[in-house]
Amino acid sequence: MVQRHPPGRPSPNRFPVAKTFTTPPHRNTTSPMHSLPKFVGALGLGLLITASTLQAATAPEGFQNLFNGTDLSGWEGNPKLWSVQEGTITGQTTAADPIKGNTFLIWKGGTVDDFELRFTYKIVPNNDQGFGNSGCQYRSKIADAGNFVVGGYQADFEAAKTYSGILYEERGRGILANRGQVTLVKPDPQSPGKTKIEVIGSVGKSEEIQAAIKDRDWNQYVVIAHGNRLLHIINGRVTVDVTDEQFTHAAKSGILAFQLHAGPAMTVQFKDVFLRPLK
């Protein structure tokens, strides 16, 4: 996510995902993903039933395993910052050698367009401020190959209690949905080239979604992108639902990457990284 300076950062109905997701008022039902509600319901049940299965390194049926559990084959990033520790992808910064900007571990298996991505993460702040921020880039682009810098859609998460689950566009339009929001992103008719974000519904209260996120422990994240509709889900709870109709900016495809955020010392870990295409 964007450079944040802890601790004073800007602050931004319970949603049972195993039930049918109802279309909020003014939802663009002509979206390529208008049939997603039924799929989300099925996904929620799958997450609840197979949670223990996702702890294994074996990919669920129909998914590709992006991490072999032993080394960073198929990934590229700064080797001083990224390694494999105890079978997990590990990114770590230190107080003695802080990084000056956000950097990323990039999946080299190609680009993704319409997909479901599942991964399990843990983030631990190694500092007095309790600061730690990371995320998963998707449909993104490499902005600086030499420094492993990426821009694009980001499924955000952090060690604090505000940003986990939001949709942020790294090196782009910024926050496209705060946690709990259903948003419609479109051009601002009053300011050509600018972005207008309309909140058209809710998937739940931010604090209730946060209560389902485990502190300094493993959490399951699911990202679904289909057409111009984007969903984030943590531990079976939908956190945002975004339809991006600013087509001059909305990415249809791009790379995947994990973020290591600049700032105080922190450790972020990933495992069980599974991908499947949606058609």
Give residue ranges: language-model regions:
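Carbohydrate-interacting regions of secretory-pathway proteins
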Residues: 56-279
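Low-complexity, intrinsically disordered or signal/transmembrane-proximal segments
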Residues: 3-5, 26, 34
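Short, Lys/Arg-enriched N-terminal segments with co-localized hydrophobic residues
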Residues: 13-32
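Bacterial N-terminal signal peptides
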Residues: 41-52
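Short, low-complexity intrinsically disordered segments enriched in A/P/G/S/L with frequent Arg
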Residues: 9-10
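Positively charged n-region of N-terminal signal peptides that target proteins for export
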Residues: 32-38
